[in-house]
Amino acid sequence: MAWTLVLLVLLGTSSCLDAKELHKKIDISALLESGSGSGEEGSSGSGSAPEPVRDQDVDWKQFKIKPEQCLDKGENCTGDPEQCQENWQEMVVQCPFSCRFCSQRSIDDVTECTDARGAACKDWADNRNDCLRFPQFMSTECTKSCKLCGKETNGKKFDKDVRCIEWAKNGYCNEGELYKEKCPHNCEVHKSIKKEPKGPYPYPTESLYPYQYWQLYPAPGPAPYPPYPYPTAAPYPYQYSPYPYTPYPPPPYPNPYPQPPYPPPPPPYPNPYPQPPYPPPPAPCSGPGPCPYPGPPPPPYPAPTPYPPPPPPYPEQVPPPPPPPPPPPPPPPYPYPYPYPDESENTKHKSKKHAKHHEKHHKENHSKKS
């Protein structure tokens, strides 16, 4: 483990090493090849084999390359993320940015209201919400896109928390000086907003580190079941005898719905038409003489009233009425006994007769006057 101690000592000497200097000072391959022993190929020898490099033996916090020097030089840096641990001595030179070997700047070191990552910052801030997901990186590399500064304050005031814009919009800047110290830019922009009564901001305003990942917050587990007051046996199908392969015999399965006892049979149905009692037999003769033979015949037994016939299941169908007889044929046209004369001839006859009568009457009047 001597080479491991050497590695830790070299890593601890500088908190901010350049990638090339780090690669020069730490030559893991030389350490792996180091060792004592003698012998040729095929012959036996003595010595100790090199121990493999383990991930937990490397202090990853010491890889703090300056942001301006932390750039990927390889072509396929994002292809296999496991190479950052398995082949880290090469990846720290070729892919320091993809392997997150860069040191993080502080918000206090920011002096210009710009985006150090260029046009990508706007996409990260607006579409991916990275200002809240990665606050340390976004607050220093995308200060303008996260709205930690702006032209409202001439780019001279910088907020120290990416949540400042939400605090200012909900009126927290008017609640105390602490918010004004952390958020000088947004408190100046939203100074006219008063705090709402209920405070709709969902995030905690005070915590040790406001952006702890969910793994760091211990999630409450499910509530434990209350203890039973007494030990309860397993359900019946799993209650086996302590003897092997001899389960308890199952009890008789009760009927889930017990049936009531059957009712007693009904008494015999009485005859709806009781029969009269039979006449008593004739009394024996009391006299000394022989009894007359044959005895008087018994009175005729009245016949029982016949049962009414059962009603038919369906009413009898009435036969349809016969069709009406066909109407008699119309009589032939009856001829008139005296056909009327033609009206035109009758009119002519009457006009001639009237003219003769008028002429005769005129002549008689004329003769009387003369």
From Swiss-Prot:
Determine if Transcription is one of this entry's keywords: no
Location comes to: Nematocyst; Secreted
Positions with biased composition (Gly residues): 36-45
In which residue ranges is the amino acid composition biased (Pro residues)?
306-340
Pfam family example for this protein?
Answer: ShK
Q: Which cysteines are joined by disulfide bonds?
A: 70-102, 77-95, 84-99, 113-149, 121-142, 131-146, 164-183, 173-187
GO terms for cellular component: extracellular region; nematocyst
Signal peptide extent: 1-19
Ranges where the record places region Disordered = 34-55, 306-370
Q: Where is the ShKT domain?
A: 70-102, 113-149, 155-190
MF terms in GO? toxin activity
Report, as the record phrases it, the tissue specificity of this protein: Nematocytes. In late planulae, transcripts are found throughout the ectoderm in nematocytes, with high concentration of expressing cells in the oral pole. In primary polyps, is expressed in nematocytes in the body wall and physa ectoderm and in the upper and lower pharynx.
Tree of life domain: Eukaryota
Biased-composition ranges, Basic residues, are 349-370
Q: Does the keyword Membrane apply?
A: no
Coiled coil stretches, renumbered? none
Keywords assigned by UniProt?
Answer: Disulfide bond, Nematocyst, Secreted, Signal, Toxin
UniProt record similarity statement: Belongs to the NEP3 family.
Q: What is this protein called?
A: Nematocyst expressed protein 4
